Design a protein with these regions (language model features):
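C-terminal catalytic ATP-binding subdomain
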Residues: 1-17
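Alpha4 helix (beta4-alpha4-beta5 surface) of REC/receiver domains from two-component response regulators
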Residues: 42, 86-87, 110-125, 138
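Acidic catalytic/metal-coordinating carboxylates
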Residues: 36, 58-61, 84-90
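Two-component/phosphorelay signaling modules centered on CheY-like receiver
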Residues: 35-54, 121
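The feature encodes the CheY-like receiver
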Residues: 81-84, 99, 111
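C-terminal output helix
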Residues: 4-7, 131-141, 148, 152
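Short amphipathic alpha-helix used as the core "switch/output" element in two-component signaling
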Residues: 64, 86-99
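Active-site beta3 strand of CheY-like receiver
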Residues: 69-75, 80
Length: 159
């Protein structure tokens, strides 16, 4: 019998952590070139009715989509064709249109120096592959909640 990517024990992590007053649809941009990783994240996010997933297959396209769509959070691979994830993060952080968006690294580069380099570059969090479902979903919730509270402050009328 084939094993599924997500065990039954882990599926509780996929339930949205929202209440009735916070039921708005959130947008996550995933920048990834590997089809297997795309499929896994699409499957995980597909179980969350509160998250809409946008996909870019390289860093340049990710930057374009981020500027045009203003996602609530971005999930980014490091090893991308063309502009890598760290370079893309730098471009997003330098642009006033996208600087506020939390960017989470999701990378196979799992050595401590890789993680330190990513966090130093400005990633909100640095997750490693293979994906640990509970950690992945908790981190997405943190990033999406940060985005919601930040946009609420930015959009709030001044007293």
């Amino acid at each position: 019998e084939p094993q599924t990517a997500v065990s039954a024990v882990e599926t509780s992590a996929l339930a949205p952590k929202t209440n009735d007053t916070d039921a708005r649809l959130r947008t996550l941009l995933y920048v990834e070139d590997n089809p297997a990783n795309l499929m896994l994240v699409e499957d995980l996010i597909g179980r969350r009715a509160d998250i809409q997933l946008l996909i870019a297959r390289d860093g340049s396209r990710g930057i374009e989509i981020a500027r045009a769509s203003q996602p609530d959070a971005i999930l980014m691979d490091i090893n991308l064709p063309g502009i890598n994830g760290i370079e893309a993060l730098g471009i997003l952080a330098a642009d006033p249109v996208t600087a506020h968006i939390p960017v989470v690294a999701l990378s196979a580069n799992a050595m401590p120096r890789d993680i330190e380099k990513g966090l130093h570059a400005g990633f909100f969090r640095y997750l490693t592959k293979p994906i640990k479902v509970n950690e992945f979903m908790d981190t997405l919730d943190l990033a999406l909640n940060l985005a919601t509270s930040t946009s609420a402050r930015v959009g709030a009328p001044k007293p």
